[in-house]
Structures are given as C-alpha cells and as structure tokens.
Amino acid sequence: MSKREDGRLDHELRPVIITRGFTENPAGSVLIEFGHTKVLCTASVTEGVPRWRKATGLGWLTAEYAMLPSATHSRSDRESVRGRLSGRTQEISRLIGRSLRACIDLAALGENTIAIDCDVLQADGGTRTAAITGAYVALADAVTYLSAAGKLSDPRPLSCAIAAVSVGVVDGRIRVDLPYEEDSRAEVDMNVVATDTGTLVEIQGTGEGATFARSTLDKLLDMALGACDTLFAAQRDALALPYPGVLPQGPPPPKAFGT
C-alpha cells in the first residue's frame, strides 16, 4: 500500500498528543496536537445561565472557536479588530457546542454554565476536529471540578465520550485526518463527530471536486469511526491520570437533627 507524503498509511492518524492542565485558571485546560495542528481547549465554569435559560433549573454549555493571527503561514488580522466574526468561525463554534451538548446531562449542572474556548495556536488541517476531541477532555475535567465543588445533582453527567476526525478522498484514495496539503486538494472532504457508544453526532461532507457514490460514503464513515476509536483510547489514557490541578472543597454534609 502506497504511503502519503508524511509517511502515513491511508487509515492512520497523525500523532495525537493530549496535555491536560496546560493552563492553570480554567476548570479544564487541554492542549491537543494532531500532528502540526495545535489547539488550546479550555472549559470554564460560571454561575448562572443565559437569560432565556433562567428559572428552568437547567445548566448550559456554550463554545467559542478562534485562530491566533499567526496560526497559519501568513498572518491574518484578529476578528475582533475586523469588528465581526467570520461565518466559518461562527459555524465551527456552534459545531463544537452542539457536539459537546450531545454528551452531557445539562439538568445535572443546575443553573451553571460551562464555557468552552478553543484557540488554534497552529493550523495544519483538522482544526475543528482537534478542537472537539480536546474540548471533550477539558469538559471531563470541568465536570470533575464541579463534582468536587458539590454543584452536580448527578455525579456522572457525561453519558459518552465525543471525538471527531476529518476524512476525505485525495488522489482517488480514501484517507483519514487530512493535513492542509491534502485537505486543500481533496475531491471529497468530510468531518465526522462520533460517540464512544458507536453513534454519530454530526457529519459534514462535501464533494469538493467531484460527486461521490453512496458506497464511498460508507467507506468514509467506516474509516472515520475506526479513527475515532483510536482517539477515544487516547482520551481515556489522558483522563486516567489524576486531575491536574487543585480541586475545590465542597460544602460539608448537613448535620443530623439534634447533633
């Protein structure tokens, strides 16, 4: 089987590195690396929920995505300087939020909000899929933080793990985890978000340079789900380590009557 320019086989992911506790202030902070793509994912806990969510007893999870000006080869202006977010930035922010809300019981949070921030430090393709995969680990740490603080009505609000990967057809071959060099010339480009229980959260697929058959779609999904299994294993290995910071002390249990 022929190898790709970076030496990988078609079904192989780039090296994946997940570093927890990358910064100190958020409840969850993760640097995730998919090869040369590097994304800082944080999960911050704030009291209260958006106005439209108040008095429901339900929590909320929101997400924001951004790229540093020097994340790509040529510097780009910050979107805050331009005065508006691009359609791409808004789309990816919503995708990350939707993906993570699929795995958490918001009722268990009470009226608290988890804010996910994904900042691309270096981009070489697959930034949104790396962001989702890393943000899940940051979210899991934020849940651990909330549990220690005694703010969860359910100690296990996460129903599954979430990971995402890109897959596409390049040079007539189905390949997974496309770097920029492949993504920029792919005939078919797809992003797949999945759970570790075998279900799908979202599929974004486009025939960039050609139409594609249903049989090709099935092969793309099979390769993507196989790659997600590898990502789930990397997430589990990362989360098997102790919480990388100082956990809060929850409120003491109520005293029994008469004591």
UniProtKB/Swiss-Prot annotation:
Q: What does this protein do?
A: Phosphorolytic 3'-5' exoribonuclease that plays an important role in tRNA 3'-end maturation. Removes nucleotide residues following the 3'-CCA terminus of tRNAs; can also add nucleotides to the ends of RNA molecules by using nucleoside diphosphates as substrates, but this may not be physiologically important. Probably plays a role in initiation of 16S rRNA degradation (leading to ribosome degradation) during starvation.
Q: Which GO terms describe its cellular component?
A: plasma membrane
Disulfide pattern:
none
NCBIfam families per the record?
RNasePH
Q: What is its EC number?
A: 2.7.7.56
In the record, biological process GO terms are: rRNA catabolic process; rRNA processing; tRNA processing
Q: Which reaction does it catalyse?
A: tRNA(n+1) + phosphate = tRNA(n) + a ribonucleoside 5'-diphosphate
Pfam families found in the cross-reference section: RNase_PH, RNase_PH_C
Q: Tell me the enzyme class.
A: transferase
Q: Which family does it belong to?
A: Belongs to the RNase PH family.
Subunit-structure text:
Homohexameric ring arranged as a trimer of dimers.
Q: Where does phosphate bind?
A: R88, G126, T127, R128
Protein name per its UniProtKB record: Ribonuclease PH
Where are the coiled-coil regions?
none
Instruction: Kindly list the GO molecular function terms attached to this UniProt entry.
Output: 3'-5'-RNA exonuclease activity; RNA binding; tRNA binding; tRNA nucleotidyltransferase activity
Q: Which UniProt keywords apply?
A: Nucleotidyltransferase, RNA-binding, rRNA processing, Transferase, tRNA processing, tRNA-binding
